[in-house]
């Protein structure tokens, strides 16, 4: 089975590269075998359409070509030539003899150079794809003309975009949105990780420059004796994975068990209990987590009660605490456990609702057959109920794990202004023991303006999430499992 998975993955990768190779092969064929107007399309993009009397398309492609040229000359050339250095002229005030005033010079802004250069590269790449495709289409029109086939008018092409090609029309705006608002920012994040963009190199007053892999070297502990990022990264990554595991599976298993309990015929007033558990969903996390943080703070109501009943003194006597309060959210071990427990309280009701919906659709004939055959409740749960739940909720389980790797709210709202690290190495890297990679990243950008290291960490988070998701889904969808539950 593993060999089949590897073969399917290899086939997918091979098919991807073959499609790219086929695209360039079609372009080469069009250039070699095309007539003069197809070859002229290499220079004038509307030539092939004009020859085949598709004048509207010819005008549109010509206007597109002119727009790309104007964009390149008027906009891109202001930034792309400076991309290799990200600017050399710093901001400073100079005295203007004409106006007799101090004015800012014509300085470089490293961030705008990087951003608009990347934007220009994306535009050029898209224009290149359109250019290649335009030549291929011009050759296709030539072959249709030679074969005596009907060539659509512009009106017929428009009609096809609302009929057989309507899916392309619907996807155009979403794809543009993903390209502009997702792809370009991710590309910017990746490139910033290879610069020294931080508080000491903050545009527009200062310039930043390329530093290669030095940020990743520092992150993985190769930055020398003065670098503590490697030390902090290992510990933050370890806690992130531990947190994601327990936060995912405690709520998943807890939700299933709670759903089974509420669906049991022996449970009285199940609707009332279900409503009480759903209350935690109804209250926004921003409110509930801040309240819980205050309850469990060093001077909160829970510590007051524990001190009154003597629990704090007992824990001090056996060495579990060394202060006059229980450090629920202010000491490493205590905070880790409390965060996971509080997350169970928040997350179990969600999983309970999901599990309830799945259990309502569990094949009753299978359950009845198992009981007739003498299976116990535990055997039914292990052999029928749980496999069915895993099959239906497996994708949600994977996404929950990835979501918990990036679960900013729970960690930040529970520990912000409450937890302070005493580990100097962690503090030097602007991290603490309860940070996830995403909260560490946030603190680096918002509090310390260390965008270079935050970008490097962001890339690591993306790689972890992407690899886990691809591997997990690949394992999950292998074989024909759906037939088992038909």
Language model: regions and residue ranges:
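A structural signal for multi-pass alpha-helical bundles of membrane permease subunits
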Residues: 76-82, 166-486
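Perimembrane loop-to-helix junctions flanking transmembrane segments
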Residues: 83-105
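N-terminal signal-anchor/first transmembrane alpha helix
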Residues: 2-25, 35-36, 43-47, 55-58, ...
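Residues in the short coil linking paired helices within alpha-helical repeat scaffolds
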Residues: 54-55, 450
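Transmembrane-helix bundle segments that line or gate the permeation/cavity pathway
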Residues: 53, 75-91, 122
């Amino acid at each position: 089975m593993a060999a089949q998975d590897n073969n399917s993955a290899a086939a997918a990768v091979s098919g991807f590269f073959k499609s790219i190779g086929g695209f360039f092969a079609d372009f080469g064929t069009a250039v070699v075998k095309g007539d003069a107007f197809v070859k002229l399309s290499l220079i004038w993009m509307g030539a092939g359409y004009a020859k085949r009397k598709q004048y509207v398309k010819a005008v549109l492609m010509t206007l597109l070509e002119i727009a790309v040229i104007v964009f390149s000359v008027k906009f891109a050339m202001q930034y792309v030539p400076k991309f290799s250095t990200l600017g050399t002229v710093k901001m400073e005030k100079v005295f203007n003899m004409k106006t007799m005033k101090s004015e800012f010079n014509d300085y470089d802004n490293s961030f705008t150079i990087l951003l608009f250069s990347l934007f220009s590269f994306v535009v050029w790449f898209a224009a290149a794809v359109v250019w290649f495709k335009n030549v291929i289409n011009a050759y296709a029109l030539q072959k249709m003309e030679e074969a005596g086939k009907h060539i659509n008018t512009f009106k017929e092409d428009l009609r096809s975009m609302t009929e057989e090609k309507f899916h392309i029309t619907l996807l155009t705006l979403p794809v543009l949105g993903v390209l502009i608002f997702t792809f370009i920012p991710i590309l910017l994040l990746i490139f910033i990780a290879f610069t020294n963009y931080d508080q000491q190199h903050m545009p527009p007053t200062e310039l930043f420059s390329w530093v290669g892999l030095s940020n990743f070297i520092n992150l993985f502990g190769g930055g020398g004796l003065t670098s503590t990022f490697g030390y902090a990264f290992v510990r933050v990554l370890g806690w992130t994975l531990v947190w994601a595991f327990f936060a995912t599976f405690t709520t998943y298993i807890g939700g299933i068990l709670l759903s089974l309990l509420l669906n049991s015929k022996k449970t009285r007033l199940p609707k009332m209990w279900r409503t009480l558990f759903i209350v935690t969903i109804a209250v926004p996390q921003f409110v509930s987590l801040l309240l819980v943080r205050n309850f469990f703070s060093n001077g909160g109501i829970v510590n007051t009660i524990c001190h009154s009943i003597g629990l704090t003194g007992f824990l001090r006597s056996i060495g579990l605490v060394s202060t006059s309060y229980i450090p629920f959210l202010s000491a490493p071990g205590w905070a880790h456990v409390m965060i996971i427990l509080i997350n169970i309280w928040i997350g179990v009701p969600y999983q309970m609702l999901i599990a309830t919906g799945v259990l309502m659709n569990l094949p009753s004939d299978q359950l009845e057959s198992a009981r007739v055959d003498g299976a116990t409740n535990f055997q039914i749960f292990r052999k029928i109920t749980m496999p069915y739940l895993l099959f239906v909720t497996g994708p949600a389980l994977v996404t929950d794990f990835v979501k918990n790797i990036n679960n900013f709210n729970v960690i930040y709202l529970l520990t912000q202004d409450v937890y302070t690290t005493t580990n100097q190495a962690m503090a030097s890297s602007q991290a603490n023991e309860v940070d996830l990679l995403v909260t560490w990243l946030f603190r680096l950008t918002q509090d310390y303006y260390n965008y270079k290291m935050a970008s490097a960490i962001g890339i690591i988070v993306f790689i972890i999430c992407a690899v886990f998701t691809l591997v997990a889904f690949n394992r999950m969808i292998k074989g024909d499992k759906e037939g088992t539950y038909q």
